Amino acid sequence: MTHRFAPTAALLVLAAFSTSVPAQTVLQTDALEQGQVLDDTQLAEAPGRAGRISLVQGKVDIGGDIGAESSPAQLNWPITSRNLISTAPGARTELRIGSTAIRLDGDSSLEVTELDDDSLRLRLHYGSVSVRVMNVDVVPEFELRTAQATVRLTQPGRLRVDAERERDTSLVSVLDGEAQVDGAGASLTVRGGRAAQVRDEDVRTLQAQRDNFDDWSLTRDQALVAAQSSRHIGTEMTGYEELDRYGSWSTSSDYGSLWTPQVAADWTPYRDGSWTFIAPWGWTWVDNAPWGYAPFHYGRWVQVRNRWAWAPGRLERRPVWSPALVGWVGGSNWNVGFQSHNLAAHGWYPLSPYDRYVPGYRLSSERLRRLNDWRHATRREQQQPGRYNGLTVVPREQFGGRGPVIVPRAPRPNRPEQLVSGTPGSAPPPPLVARPGWNRDRRDLLERANVGQTGVERPAFERPGLERPTLERPAL
C-alpha cells in the first residue's frame, strides 16, 4: 500500500499509521489524510486514554503483542492496549492510569489486554501485581484475569493477585474494598482482609496476608498524594501525582490554572526527551523529567514573564489524551545550517491556548472540540506563521530510522535565532516500513491474545528451569 499525504499547515501534528510496537517495527498502511476529522459513528478512532510507566526499578521490559520484540521500559512511556510488561527477579515497576496505580513485583508478567475510554482489562500471566483503584467511575471498567480466575471490583479498593507462584494456582487478596472472583466454576464475593485461592477445580477462602511488596505499594500510595494538583486538574489526568513535588500552582485571568516547573530559566518544553512512533497516534513525545507526562499530553504551554508555564485548561472528569500538543514545521524543502552543512530539517513548538490542535490520527469531532475548547483563550489570535515560540529544530534524517529521535543528542542549527520566518508546515515521516508478511503474523498473535473473546488457546508463559517459591506472608 502507499502513503497519501495532503498539504499541511504549520499547526499540523503527528501523522499516524495503524500499527507499531515499542521495538520500533512499524507496518506501512494507508495514512489518514492530515487534519481529517471522522464522524462520531466511525469506529477507527484512537483511544482518548493512555497510561504511563511511572517507576522502573531493576530490569523491566515492555513489548507490544505477545511474541513481539521487547525493549527496556522507560519512565513516562505511554501504556496502551496489548502492551506486555515483564520484570526480572528483584525488579519492580509501576503503571499509572489516572488515579489508578498498578504495580508489578519481581519475576512477573502483566499484559494490558485493553485500555481505552471505557475499559481497563489486564491479564497476569505469572508473578504478583498490586492494584489500587480509588475512583468509583473506574470500578465497572476494571477487570483482571489469570489462567484460573477473573477478578472484578465492586467498589474502590486495593487488591493483590498472585499467579503461578504455586503451579496452576491464583491467589486473590483483597486488602481494601470488595471484589468478585470467578473461577473453577464458582463465583464468590471477597471482602477486605480476605483472599480466594483458585485452582483449576477448587476454590477456597482464607485470610489475606501481606508482605514487603504490599508494604512498598502502600508507601508509594502515601507518598504520591497531590492535594494541590487534584484541585486544579483532578485525579484522572495521568501524571497529576508528580506535579506538586516539582513545581507550583497559580491562577491567571488569561489562562486559568497555571503550573510552573522548577527548571532553569532558559528551559523550553519538548526539548529534553525523545520522539517515538506509537500506534495508533504516530510520533509521540516521551519526556525525561520525572514530572514530564501530564504537561506534555494534556493542556498547553504559555510564557509568563519570560518563563514557561503549563496551562491544563478546564477541569474535566477525564481529559482527552494526546501524543504531543505541538505544531510541526519544516520538511524536505526547508534547509537549515547544521555545523558545516545545510540539511533538510523538521521542527516543532509547543502549542499555546490560542493555537488549534489538528491531529494526524483519527479523532472524533467531539474529542477535538474538547482538546481545543479554551474558555480563557479569547483575547488573542493564534501564533502567526513564522512566530513559533519554543521552536526546536533537528535534521530531517533524524526521523528516518527505526529508533526513537533522542532530542538532546540531535544536532542543532548554527543560527537558531534566524528560524523565525518562512518555515513551511510539515509533519515528520513515519519510520521505516516493516518486512512483508508482518501484518499476517501480527494478526495471528492478536487472535491468540484474545482468548477471553475468541476461545483460542493462549500460549503458555512457563519458563523452564525456574522454580517459583511458595508465598509466605504474615496475616493481616
Question: Which residues make up each language-model segment?
Answer:
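Compositionally biased, intrinsically disordered low-complexity segments enriched
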Residues: F5, V26, D30, Q36-L38, ...
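Cleavable N-terminal signal peptides
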Residues: A10-L11, V21
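Bacterial N-terminal signal peptides that target proteins for export
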Residues: M1-A9
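Intrinsically disordered, low-complexity regions enriched for glutamine and histidine
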Residues: M1-T2, P22, V26, L32-Q34, ...
